[in-house]
Amino acid sequence: MARGKAKEEGSWKKFIWNSEKKEFLGRTGGSWFKILLFYVIFYGCLAGIFIGTIQVMLLTISEFKPTYQDRVAPPGLTQIPQIQKTEIAFRPNDPKSYMTYVDNIDNFLKKYRDSAQKDDMIFEDCGNVPSELKDRGEFNNEQGERKVCRFKLEWLGNCSGINDETYGYKEGKPCVIIKLNRVLGFKPKPPKNESLETYPVMKYNPYVLPVQCTGKRDEDKEKVGSIEYFGLGGYPGFPLQYYPYYGKLLQPKYLQPLLAVQFTNLTMDTEIRIECKAYGENIGYSEKDRFQGRFDVKIEVKS
């Protein structure tokens, strides 16, 4: 039995290294070299085919604009202050209750201050009244970076933070800043004038994508009170000259046009649900995405 075990152990060692035939694991050095060379060439060819395929694919893709955008959803509508539960609740006589909202608006508006828009190589004045879409050429690097339209804080009126650093929260008249999310190459199409007849107090301009805020439910509409809008030229919406957006590579300092909404007479001690919607021929809404073209926020001013 001991001899059989020794014989088995010897054959195992011989398989690993056969000193007579100079074989390692049953193969000579030349055999190992040939098989390793085969696999190096084989996997090298596979890698070359893969890299070549990727390179060909990359040649068809622009780094400045997606090749296909037919399934890109319309832009979403967002409010500032940005809050997790879309609820704004505060007491006008308690600064601690609303300073989070004020700081949030402050931080967002920093890039809209005059001091941040001084460079004439980057920014340009696009007028104080709404105008047509601003075509800045093809989506490529032939013309270098594109200029960006300035947006003045003073256009936001009572909600600019210039005269009231609390944006109305100290007086129980909260401001909400509204922006349309960036979508590369998106060109807003304002609705026809006749299509807005069902929406009261909507100031029409063919070069403005209008926005309106109302109570979400019937009981909310009675409690919202008066609403003031502050935007470029006094229009409640987004002027077209700020579009289209050319992306971070061509417009790294791009500023979205803003609309400020101030609720000046909210019913106290009542949670009011408010919905704001943008209106346009290419603005859509989705039940699955409550921020697509609209948003709703709950506001409660406590005594």
UniProtKB/Swiss-Prot annotation:
It is a single-pass type II membrane protein. The chain crosses the membrane at residues 35-62. Glutathionylated. N-glycosylated. It comes from Ovis aries (Sheep). The modification Phosphoserine is found at S11. The C-terminal lobe folds into an immunoglobulin-like domain and mediates cell adhesion properties. The keyword Translocase does not apply. Keywords: Cell adhesion, Cell membrane, Disulfide bond, Glutathionylation, Glycoprotein, Immunity, Innate immunity, Ion transport, Membrane, Phosphoprotein, Potassium, Potassium transport, Signal-anchor, Sodium, Sodium transport, Sodium/potassium transport, Transmembrane, Transmembrane helix, Transport. The gene is ATP1B1. It is found in: Cell membrane; Apical cell membrane; Cell membrane, Sarcolemma. This is Sodium/potassium-transporting ATPase subunit beta-1. Glycans are attached at N158, N193, N265. Residues 1-34 are cytoplasmic.
